[in-house]
Design a protein with these regions (language model features):
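A well-structured
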Residues: 1-291, 297-302, 390-404
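Active-site-adjacent bridging/hinge elements
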Residues: 120-122, 224-230, 271-276, 334-347, ...
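Short flexible/disordered coil segments
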Residues: 136, 143, 276-291, 329-347, ...
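Active-site-adjacent "gating/activation" loops or surface patches in catalytic cores
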Residues: 165-180, 289, 293-370
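Zinc-dependent metallohydrolase catalytic domains
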Residues: 323-333, 340-342, 368-405
Length: 405
């Protein structure tokens, strides 16, 4: 047996070869909805079968999203993603709600092992409380609209010293010891973004209105409160976040102000500009711990392998199975994410890597998240958690890509 071959989980309920069309999916949902359940054991089997269906859909959607973000300029990949978003998900949503209700209303629910199923039950009840039929077309539109951002930003590039760079690649010049080089890079990046200012502002306003309507339809005052519920944030509230923000303002901001003053003095500048914030104050050139994506992957595997041989082996297998895309290039979506693949039992890692130290931290963050996916691949009750965690990962990637420059 080749340890580098990652085998997908064997299906026991669905066909081993399954084309995602509504004609193929509809009978499966119908059988799950109509199946008679006469005991806790049968309820668990129903959950396993439903989880298998969820895993099939999640991984199919995952690969459509991954391929699209790897090449935002490929219209066929965009159409493939949009087919799922517009033709499959809107039909699946009400049936998922029906299956959620069947699960929660089962007389055998209380007989399940609560230590194993409590989180799944809690999340399913939350999904039932949030579901609104009128939100299905809105969420479909949101799915399609928000991908326009990646297409627009993925196409951005600048020319520095006669060579074309993606914005992430150009950001490496912000660490250059020559101030004019840094200034030119920062202004070039900013000016390129400003070209799309009106387009991106219009897109933001469109999405804001759609998301606010989704929240109001679900009886929330705003989208923030709706997403706290949708992401399953049961352990802290928006008020907790506000208190944390205030604590940062009182304790961290003054420290950062002192650091900025020290930086200004060390660089012997009358005032700090945005292009002065990343250069080494000692005058040393920027760290360049890897020359390309292949070396970044190899060094990361070696590092993690020394921490935990099993994790190193799994990352080596992920590399062999093409589960990394770490190079920055034109047409690649900005930001980074770790996308769990429900049937494969391993994630796809898509960091916004640059040939500098930040690239190492991006990949390290992603692989620490990947460790969770690797170790939880056999969890039969993990579907709801996978969905919420993936959504948080992708939204975090979008936020980071917007805030980086």
């Amino acid at each position: 047996m080749n340890d580098l071959v990652i085998k997908k989980k064997e299906r026991t309920y669905l066909k081993s070869v399954f084309e995602i069309t509504w004609e193929n999916l509809s009978p499966i949902f119908d059988e799950l909805a109509k199946r008679s359940i006469g005991s806790a054991t049968e309820l668990e089997q129903w959950l396993r079968d439903r989880s298998e269906l969820d895993a099939l859909l999640e991984e199919d959607f995952a690969w459509r999203y991954i391929r699209m973000t790897c090449n935002t300029a490929d219209e066929a990949l965009l159409n493939s993603f949009q087919y799922f978003a517009t033709e499959i998900e809107p039909k699946v949503a009400p049936l998922n709600d029906q299956l959620n209700r069947k699960f929660i209303e089962s007389p055998f629910l209380t007989e399940l092992d609560q230590s194993k199923y409590a989180i799944l039950i809690r999340g399913t009840k939350q999904a039932l409380a949030l579901f609104r039929e009128e939100n299905i077309p809105l969420q479909t539109t949101i799915q399609v609209e928000q991908q326009k951002y990646q297409g627009i930003t993925g196409a951005m590039s600048v020319t520095l010293n006669g060579q074309e760079y993606t914005l992430e690649q150009a950001a490496t010049f912000l660490k250059d010891t020559n101030r004019e080089t840094r200034k030119n890079a920062w202004q070039s990046i900013s000016n390129r973004r400003l070209v799309e200012k009106d387009t991106l502002n219009d897109l933001f306003n469109t999405l804001r209105a759609l998301r606010h309507q989704v929240a109001q339809n679900a009886n929330f005052d705003n989208f923030r409160d709706y997403m706290f519920a949708a992401l399953g944030r049961f352990d802290y509230t928006a008020e907790d976040c506000f208190q944390f923000h205030e604590a940062i303002e009182k304790t961290v901001v003054p420290v950062l102000a002192k650091h900025a003053d020290a930086r200004k003095k060390a660089l012997a500048l009358p005032s700090l500009q945005p292009w002065d914030m990343e250069v080494d104050t000692s005058g040393k050139p920027a760290l360049k711990p890897f020359k390309d994506g292949a070396e970044l992957i190899e060094k990361s595997i070696t590092c993690f392998g020394k921490l935990d041989p099993f994790l190193g082996e799994r990352l080596q297998a992920m590399k062999a199975n093409g589960l990394f895309d770490v190079e920055s290039r034109k047409g690649k979506a900005p930001g980074g994410y770790n996308y769990p693949l429900a049937e494969t039992g391993a994630p796809f890692i898509f960091p916004g890597s640059k040939e500098q130290y930040n690239g190492v931290t991006d990949v390290t963050d992603a692989r620490l998240l990947a460790r969770h996916a690797v170790w939880s691949e056999k969890d039969p009750a993990g579907t709801g958690r996978r969905r919420a965690e993936t959504l948080q990962s992708l939204q975090g990637a979008e936020r980071r890509s917007r805030c980086e420059f």
